[in-house]
């Protein structure tokens, strides 16, 4: 994912900063404890498609 895009995207739920999980290739909101898919380089930032993080994924 483009680093410039990563700097401007925000969580659609809390509007907070998202982090890129290099392992799963998902954008993670540690505040809401959810992850968002990245489809062909485009983040899918729909609150209804957010996936809850497992306990292991919650660590920054």
Curated annotation (Swiss-Prot):
Family note: Belongs to the UPF0434 family.
Protein name as annotated: UPF0434 protein PM0859
Highest taxon listed in the record's lineage: Bacteria
Gene Ontology CC annotation, any one: cytosol
The species this protein was found in: Pasteurella multocida (strain Pm70)
Residues spanning the membrane: none
């Amino acid at each position: 994912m483009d680093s410039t895009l990563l700097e401007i995207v925000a969580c659609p739920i809390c509007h907070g900063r998202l982090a890129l999980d290099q392992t799963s290739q998902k954008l993670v909101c540690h505040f809401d404890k959810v992850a968002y898919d990245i489809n062909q380089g485009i983040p899918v930032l729909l609150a209804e498609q957010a996936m809850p993080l497992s306990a292991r994924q919650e660590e920054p």
